[in-house]
Amino acid sequence: MTDVPRMVTPERRSDDVGDTVLRPQRLAEFVGQAQARANLQIFIDAARKRKEALDHVLFVGPPGLGKTTLAQIVARELGVGFRATSGPVIAKAGDLAALLTNLEERDVLFIDEIHRLSPAVEEVLYPAMEDFQLDLIIGEGPAARSVKIELSKFTLVGATTRAGLLTNPLRDRFGIPVRLNFYTVDELEKIVSRGARVLDVGMTADGANEIARRARGTPRIAGRLLRRVRDFASAADAASINRKIADHALGALEVDAAGLDAMDRRYLTTIALNYGGGPVGVETMAAALSEPRDAIEDIIEPFLIQCGYLQRTPRGRLLTSHAFRHLGLTEPSRDPSQFGLFGGEDE
């Protein structure tokens, strides 16, 4: 069941508090996202030279890629204050007003999950971002009056995993959109090696590579796996983490060589054995796995699609040859029309 915490989930878990010590503090320490990093450095340097607030920044990308870390680094590089909140926490316009009126000149306000702001809060945010003013309605009925409050010039840094849910007026007010992509194994190796140094644990190159290969392109997962592998190394009184120790630890955690866990393999195996590799509708899979549809679509499937194990077709979910090879199963012969664009809607 997906309510059991998964070792390889990119979402933040309660036990991830330990990863704060692994976060880079400066852009120079940040590994990966080379183009985004280079552009941010230029924008930050320019704003600092002009002694102006940085234009509003929007970070877009899957969970665990460093959106929050980059927001903190932006404030640190600018030498200004940093306030953090999230879309669901700002329930009403007054909550947003309280945050904005307490900002100093050029401060950074970070709103995670900004796509989850309510329409009423968004309406208040528009003039704040554009004109650095708050337009509030005080009172009700005939006694209601409009109040305009001047704000310090600030930088709003928004983060979202679902850019498509942002309204156009909100999206258009961000002068610096930054898309974050999954990390390469080489980049994750550097992140794991740096994390090992921070945690004061020995790490061989092949040990770092083994953890990086199973981290699903996501630094948050790499840090989580590193902390758990360190536990296995400590229990075995090992002087450092090598490939053998990492392989044993990750095997015990049921994270295989491709970064798939027990839930991923159960999903793929169900389609392979029960439905001949597909196509099979998502509602059928939800019933077969006793999982809600949104958990399958948002939690299980994205990585499988990204790695080429799964296709979403109009007729349903379909396993690829790559998936059968990974499972060690023989791929059945299938009608080529199953891969077509027509022939029925997916459930």
Curated annotation (Swiss-Prot):
The domain of life for this entry's organism is: Bacteria
Q: Write out the ranges of the annotated region (Small ATPAse domain (RuvB-S)).
A: 184-254
- Annotated region Large ATPase domain (RuvB-L): the residues are 1-183
Biological process (GO) annotations?
DNA recombination; DNA repair
Q: What is its EC number?
A: 3.6.4.-
> What SMART domains does the entry give?
AAA
Q: Where is the signal peptide?
A: none
Q: Does the keyword Nucleotide-binding apply?
A: yes
- Indicate the principal place this protein occupies in or around the cell: cytoplasm
Question: What positions does the entry give for DNA binding?
Answer: 293, 312, 317
Q: List the keywords (alphabetical).
A: ATP-binding, Cytoplasm, DNA damage, DNA recombination, DNA repair, DNA-binding, Hydrolase, Nucleotide-binding
Alphabetized Pfam families for the sequence: AAA_lid_4 (PF17864), RuvB_C (PF05491), RuvB_N (PF05496)
What is the enzyme's main class? hydrolase
Q: Does the keyword Iron-sulfur apply?
A: no
Per the record, its GO cellular-component terms are: cytoplasm; Holliday junction resolvase complex
| Segments of this protein annotated with the region Head domain (RuvB-H) | 257-347
As for subcellular location, the record says: Cytoplasm
Single GO MF descriptor: four-way junction DNA binding
Annotated residues that bind Mg(2+) are located at 68
Reaction catalyzed: ATP + H2O = ADP + phosphate + H(+)
What is the recorded function of this protein according to its Swiss-Prot or TrEMBL entry? The RuvA-RuvB-RuvC complex processes Holliday junction (HJ) DNA during genetic recombination and DNA repair, while the RuvA-RuvB complex plays an important role in the rescue of blocked DNA replication forks via replication fork reversal (RFR). RuvA specifically binds to HJ cruciform DNA, conferring on it an open structure. The RuvB hexamer acts as an ATP-dependent pump, pulling dsDNA into and through the RuvAB complex. RuvB forms 2 homohexamers on either side of HJ DNA bound by 1 or 2 RuvA tetramers; 4 subunits per hexamer contact DNA at a time.
HAMAP family according to UniProt: DNA_HJ_migration_RuvB
Known partners and oligomeric status:
Homohexamer. Forms an RuvA(8)-RuvB(12)-Holliday junction (HJ) complex. HJ DNA is sandwiched between 2 RuvA tetramers; dsDNA enters through RuvA and exits via RuvB. An RuvB hexamer assembles on each DNA strand where it exits the tetramer. Each RuvB hexamer is contacted by two RuvA subunits (via domain III) on 2 adjacent RuvB subunits; this complex drives branch migration. In the full resolvosome a probable DNA-RuvA(4)-RuvB(12)-RuvC(2) complex forms which resolves the HJ.
Identify its protein family.
Belongs to the RuvB family.
Comment field on protein domains: Has 3 domains, the large (RuvB-L) and small ATPase (RuvB-S) domains and the C-terminal head (RuvB-H) domain. The head domain binds DNA, while the ATPase domains jointly bind ATP, ADP or are empty depending on the state of the subunit in the translocation cycle. During a single DNA translocation step the structure of each domain remains the same, but their relative positions change.
Q: What is this protein called?
A: Holliday junction branch migration complex subunit RuvB
- What organism is the protein native to? Nitrobacter hamburgensis (strain DSM 10229 / NCIMB 13809 / X14)
